[in-house]
Amino acid sequence: IDALLLTAGLLESLGQFDLAIAVYRDVPADDPAYHVAELGRADALRRSGEEEKAIEVLEQLTRSHGALAVVHSTLGDVLRADEDFAGAILAYNKAIDLASEKAPVRWVLYYSRGIAHERAGDEVASEADFRAALAINPDQPQVLNYLGYSMVEQQRNLDEALDMIERAVAASPDSGYIVDSLGWVLFRLGRYQEAVGHMERAVELLAVDPVVNDHLGDVYWAVGRAREAEFQWRRALSFMDRGSMDTEADPDRIRLKLEVGLDQVLEEEGAPSLKVGNDI
């Protein structure tokens, strides 16, 4: 059985998903490693684009091996990726109920459920889960960054958000998304000059990410570097045009910034204007 699992895993790592799926299916249902094989088969199905079949495999596994937290958490991950956030939350609920109070993985479950709540629009439940994850793993950079960035986007608790993101950067200094968050919270706080270096570093780390390039454009605009801002906004648009990248960047808003400038866009949105004298 170990040889079958090893072979299937190797085939999957080589992108031979159909062959991997076939090998995973050779593990008998009465074998103690059956759930491992089925989790592998579901992953191979998902990676081959067969999300619905992957979900079917995992749902069947919840019926045959429902006492295992990993089965429910994996189902939650796939449902969340499929944007079935309500279903993902239910799966994570079950995983959290089953996981030992002392299990190191519990923070991951709260973090994952927090993302599902956030994507479903429940900011209160989302924050509660992120804080539960931090209670278990206080310096986890992904959680610190996600919660900090969420608060920045909601324009609240900015000082706490800055502290969280600074801790995240200290723990993971080469993560472009986390460095971007630090630059962005400084921008939101009106500390534009301080934001420049962090945003430039984020673009170095994530050169083709449209959101990061858009953010750098906004920061450049705020410090009076209009031509460089327009260049970054055009870069952001070009990376969005190259494919169906899942991104929070709004191409229409970027085009409007290119047409009338960031100040005018903020005014039309009823958002706070950029601060004058921002070296604070």
Indicate where each model-derived feature is located.
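TPR alpha-solenoid repeat register
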Residues: 3, 37, 71, 105, ...
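Structural marker of alpha-solenoid helical repeat scaffolds
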Residues: 30, 63-65, 98-102, 136, ...
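Residue-level recognition of tetratricopeptide repeat
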Residues: 9, 43, 77, 115, ...
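Register position in tetratricopeptide repeats
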Residues: 13, 47-48, 81, 112, ...
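Terminal, low-structured helical/coil segments at or just beyond the last alpha-helical repeat
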Residues: 230-280
